[in-house]
Amino acid sequence: MSTLRKTLKDNRWACWLVLACLVVPMFASYFFDDMFSSLSELFKNPEYLELGWNMADYGFYASGYSFLCIWGGLIVCGALLDRFGVRLVGSIFVGLMVGGAGLVTFAISAGFEPKTSLTIAYIGCMLFGLGSEIAGVSVTRSIAKWFKGRNMALAMGLQLAIARFGTATAILIAPMIVKQKALGEFYTLAETNKPALIGLAVLAVGAILWAVFVAMVGWLD
């Protein structure tokens, strides 16, 4: 059994399988983060949104992504990652990323008053942002370990390219999901929350693949 594990760990195809498991959570993270960027015009007329947010509200919500990161969250969590390893800490923060996205989706779907939904969504965005950034560090560290001495730069480049494709996908398909209406027509929550629901579903797939990665690494180690 130990010989089989060593053979798989040294097999270059195992490395690419690991990469395949790692890139999906990052793709999903970038997609969810940018899902409203091409829909920002909607917030210019909050009176036509059941959500009720204006441009300032949307800007406030989006700023939540960086709040915990710039106040030492990345440093503290990076130290925890060094201390306890990718499998434990990375899993916690992938979970935090998905949980934060779930809280955002709940906030913009439940029919709260605008200020209440904004507050809940902001908290969710803070958790999502910190989870996403530490998950990204975990992915980079895992790639460095698995591709040590072989195709490391290529693997990191592919990971980043696929993650950025999440941004491009969000920008391209969000206007198709929430179709623009004539000025004066009303947008319901069921319409404006569609990008978040899709993003949350992709994040859930990413979390499952992260779990596959953790299980595989645990077995091979």
Feature-to-residue mapping (PLM):
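C-terminal ends and interior cores of transmembrane alpha-helices
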Residues: 95-114
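Cytoplasmic helix-loop-helix junction between adjacent transmembrane helices
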Residues: 124-161
